[in-house]
Design a protein with these regions (language model features):
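Ribonuclease/tRNase effector modules and their secretory precursors
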Residues: 1-86
Length: 86
């Protein structure tokens, strides 16, 4: 199941030349994911994935107890998150 994209997830689309499709592809092709905090509902996770052109993206996704998923942040991965892939 793919998450819904919140408007805030599109903040860096122009600068990083992202599209809804590239972000959802990267989400589906995650290389790493981890929780960002200890919250119960919604749970906030960092997801690092690769899009169709090989770019590594960082995304933040909210997972709700009801089963919903909302992607609230997407951009080209910063160095701090790339280093986690080593």
């Amino acid at each position: 199941m793919s998450p819904k994209l919140h408007a805030s997830a599109r903040k860096h689309f122009g600068r990083d030349r992202l599209t809804d499709e590239s972000v959802l592809y990267a989400y589906e092709h995650a290389l790493n994911s981890r929780p960002l905090d200890d919250e119960d509902d919604p749970r906030r996770w960092l997801v690092v994935g690769i899009d169709q052109s090989g770019r590594v993206l960082e995304m933040v996704v909210l997972y709700f107890d009801s089963g919903g998923e909302l992607l609230i942040h997407a951009m080209k991965a910063r160095l701090q998150f790339l280093e986690e892939l080593r």
